[in-house]
A protein has these predicted regions:
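Conserved redox-active cysteine motifs that mediate thiol-disulfide chemistry
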Residues: 475, 483-501, 520
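C-terminal substrate/ligand-recognition segments
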Residues: 457-460, 474-479, 487-491, 505-506
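A non-transmembrane, solvent-exposed segment enriched in polar/low-complexity residues
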Residues: 3-216
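Acidic, polar-rich low-complexity tracts and alpha-helical solenoid repeat scaffolds
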Residues: 53-60, 68, 442-455, 508
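Conserved helix-turn-beta segment immediately C-terminal to the redox Cys motif
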Residues: 477-478, 495-517, 530
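Oxidative protein folding and maturation machinery
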Residues: 149, 156-472
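Short, internal strand/loop/helix patches
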Residues: 362-363, 526-534
Length: 534
């Protein structure tokens, strides 16, 4: 609890504290403290974090089954670090988000004190300035932070693990998948095993030096390394065609045996990277990589939609489909990429999916993605995963589609959601996000942006010519140019995280902000600029 000083005699070490109508006497002297009528032996904290706890703790993590619950945070932050003066916040990973964390502002009074309630699905990790905290629904925590000294303490019944993490940082996965862009999966997995041997040494050294570290610390340290490795490894889905052909299943088998068959309990402990990692892992199981680099399933759905709606010449669509099937059979048959570089399928893709074509308009609508999703969600039931992870996979897939569409649930997705078994917390998160986009659409104002007409640019092919035409009205001004798309997840992450701080930092300069969005539907574009306040 936070108490106010009513009286203070620092020379005698005597204090009177008040909280509402309650009063408390406090007397301090070297090595002892008297609170009310009770005496305590104390020692002054001079280090940045607490020393190791003197007793063993073999308790397990509390798992509430992802029903959600409130966590109360109280505390004081002094000497706020540079760059955070205008906004101190707490970052809460969302178990269904593949990229964004939820950030909540912390309102401090003139003395740096704060009180905040947050909702968590389950026991999990949050970040507050430089501190990584483990919080459990139903608990109250008091946090003391000093941005100048870095001194950080957490108090409360469930504070031990947070203090241990502040004192003993956990080792992270250090293999860069990008260093293996032209190497086989087997070579990458050899590097993973070497990194595992490295962290085993760190764990052994740390636990020998600090034998009282809790069981929960030991478990979390291992789970976090494995999830860091998994997050990096699943990105092999996007590597070069040559790498894709080297896939012997070893990488995906390791993920199954070492990560998803022995995942953290509760898995919200590793939710920082879990949604993205798991989404890619299940996508690989449902739609394995191919060495051709194309999403044939996606192209097929776009062709099907165009045929159903008579939005493109049927003969042209038939030629594209026939060429794709020929190309796909050669890819699956192991034909070297060098012999496929002149295949007519490449030219057909460039021609029929160019800007302004019917197929490109269909892609912008995100409808092909939704059709694939509707087919794949039932297929998740057949995957070799625990029931808990199957439900997570389905929830992440639906939530990710909302983010991709930047709009509310379609009728088809809502029907699938109603028919899919998942924890109520997941369902509520999806429905809340859908309502958010629906409300955003209802109050959207188009005054912040305008559609660029295609006609003046139709005959321009050179990139410099196109950019000169776009920038001509702003010549002589300072222009900040950002090119993005509603389909581009990193673009949207940067817009969400950096737009407001950038505008604030440059507020005294005569800057014109120009955000160019391409290959995106009008609806998704309008929704995104409203959300990010562009």
């Amino acid at each position: 609890e936070i108490w106010e000083y009513a009286k203070a005699d620092t020379l005698k070490g005597e204090y009177m504290l008040r909280r509402g109508k309650d009063a408390l006497k406090l007397k301090l002297k070297e090595g002892s403290m008297r609170i009310g009528q009770k005496n305590y032996t104390v020692s002054k904290l001079t280090e940045r974090t607490l020393p190791d706890y003197p007793t063993k703790d073999e308790s397990d993590f509390l798992d509430n089954g992802n029903v959600g619950g409130k966590v109360t945070l109280r505390g004081r932050i002094v000497n706020v670090p540079k760059g955070h003066e205008d906004r101190v916040s707490i970052s809460i990973p969302d178990p269904l988000q593949t990229i964004f964390d939820n950030e909540l502002p912390i309102e401090c009074d003139s003395l740096g004190r704060f009180e905040l309630d947050i909702e968590l699905a389950n026991t999990g990790v949050v970040r507050m300035l430089w501190a990584k905290l483990i919080l459990t629904p139903g608990e109250t925590y008091f946090i003391s932070m000093d941005g100048q000294t870095g001194q950080t303490f957490v108090m409360g019944r469930d504070s031990r693990l947070s203090n241990e993490l502040l004192t003993h940082d956990t080792p992270y996965y250090k293999v860069k998948s990008s260093d293996f862009d032209k190497k086989s999966d087997a070579e990458l997995m050899e590097a993973v095993e070497k990194d595992y041997e490295r962290v085993k040494e760190i764990w052994m050294t740390t636990e020998q030096a600090s034998p009282m570290l809790s069981k929960r610390y030991r478990l979390l340290s291992r789970w976090q390394w494995k999830m860091g490795a998994a997050y990096s490894l699943v990105q092999r889905r996007y590597d070069s065609p040559d790498v894709r052909k080297s896939d012997d299943g070893q990488l995906w088998q390791w993920l199954r045996d070492s990560v998803f068959s022995d995942i953290a309990r509760p898995y919200t402990l590793v939710q920082d990277d879990l949604a993205y990692t798991f989404d890619n892992y299940t996508s690989e199981l449902l739609k394995p990589r191919n060495s051709g680099g194309y999403s044939f399933e996606f192209i097929e759905e776009a062709i099907n939609i165009a045929e159903e709606r008579n939005q493109a010449d049927k003969d042209s669509l038939a030629i594209l489909s026939q060429s794709m099937n020929d190309y796909r059979s050669k890819v699956n048959g192991g034909t070297p990429d060098s012999l496929l570089s002149d295949h007519p399928f490449h030219a057909l893709i460039r021609q029929m999916f160019a800007n302004g074509t019917p197929l490109m308009q269909i892609i912008k609508s995100t409808e092909p993605n939704e059709r694939i999703l509707l087919k794949n969600i039932p297929r998740v039931r057949d995957l070799d995963l625990s029931e808990e992870l199957k439900q997570l996979s389905q929830a992440v897939a639906i939530y990710s589609q909302l983010e991709q569409m930047h709009g509310p649930l379609s009728d088809a997705l809502r029907k699938v959601l109603d028919e899919t078994v998942m924890p109520p917390y997941y369902r509520d998160r999806i429905l809340m996000r859908s309502k958010y986009f629906a409300d955003l659409a209802a109050k959207m104002k188009r005054g912040n942006g305008c559609l660029m007409p295609n006609e003046p640019l139709a005959d321009l092919k050179d990139g410099k010519e196109i950019m000169d035409w776009i920038l001509e009205p702003y010549r002589g001004r300072i222009v900040y140019l950002d090119i993005w798309g509603t389909w581009c997840v990193p673009c949207k992450a940067n817009l969400k995280q950096f737009t407001k701080p950038l505008h604030q930092k440059l507020r005294d300069l005569p800057v014109t902000y120009l955000y160019l969005c391409n290959n995106s539907s009008d609806k998704a574009w309008a929704s995104a600029i409203a959300e990010y306040e562009l």
